[in-house]
């Protein structure tokens, strides 16, 4: 069974100031098998981010289905899943990484990843959360001297690796990467993919 199946997905947006509708995506269908890397390509504005936001449910589609094979709920349509189901899936089964770092202004790199670890393993298992935080930071080549710094001082590549470390520490079954490497050179993009591949193999 596919991990994710998208069937005839459509989403449009209304620009109220100009009274016009624009099509985010139209009649999109594809599936993803467990363990697969799938890339969505297209020019800017073609709907790549719209599709991912529909999966993450920050955008609600107007047509189609997004069928996800959940460990807890079985086959669930993310378009009609309850808010409680979506909160659980985002916490334990789905991960989302954008090109922008989502963190409080005065959170250190270590605190950002630790927060995700505590959500995954529970506040009562802080020792495990701290150990996993250190392991994940090291895996994504974030030097120990960076751990207590604020990410606003980081390079684009360092911010991206931190973002992915925070998402991957929860060991999501499905990780959505919304153009996170857009500002990186080809060598950095390849490095990020290699790190994710290595971690995926280790967590099997």
Name each model-derived stretch:
Residues 56:
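Helix-to-loop junction immediately C-terminal to a conserved catalytic motif
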Residues 150-154, 158:
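Conserved ABC ATPase signature
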Residues 127-145:
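Conserved ABC ATPase "signature" region
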Residues 171:
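Conserved catalytic motifs of ABC-family nucleotide-binding domains
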Residues 167-168:
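ABC ATPase C-loop
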Residues 175-178:
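Catalytic Walker B motif of ABC-type/P-loop ATPase nucleotide-binding domains
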Residues 100, 107-119:
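Q-loop/switch helix immediately C-terminal to the Walker
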Residues 65-88:
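ABC ATPase NBD Q-loop/coupling interface
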């Amino acid at each position: 069974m596919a991990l994710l199946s998208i069937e005839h997905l459509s989403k449009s947006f209304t620009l109220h100031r100009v009274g016009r509708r624009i099509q985010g995506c139209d009649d999109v269908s594809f599936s993803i098998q467990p363990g697969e890397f799938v890339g969505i390509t297209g020019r800017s504005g073609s709907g790549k981010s719209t599709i991912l936001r529909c999966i993450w449910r920050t955008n609600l589609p107007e047509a189609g289905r997004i069928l996800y094979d959940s460990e807890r709920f079985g086959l669930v349509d993310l378009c009609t899943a309850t808010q409680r189901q979506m909160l659980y899936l985002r916490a334990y089964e789905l991960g989302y990484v954008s090109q922008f770092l989502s963190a409080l202004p005065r959170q250190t790199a270590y605190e950002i990843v630790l927060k995700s670890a505590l959500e995954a393993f529970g506040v009562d298992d802080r020792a495990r959360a701290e150990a996993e935080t250190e392991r994940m930071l090291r895996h994504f080549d974030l030097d120990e001297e960076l751990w207590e710094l604020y990410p606003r001082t980081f390079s684009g590549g360092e911010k991206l690796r931190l973002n992915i470390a925070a998402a991957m520490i929860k060991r999501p079954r499905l990780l959505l990467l919304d153009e996170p490497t857009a500002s990186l050179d080809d060598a950095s993009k390849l490095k990020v993919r290699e790190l994710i591949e290595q971690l995926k193999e280790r967590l099997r």
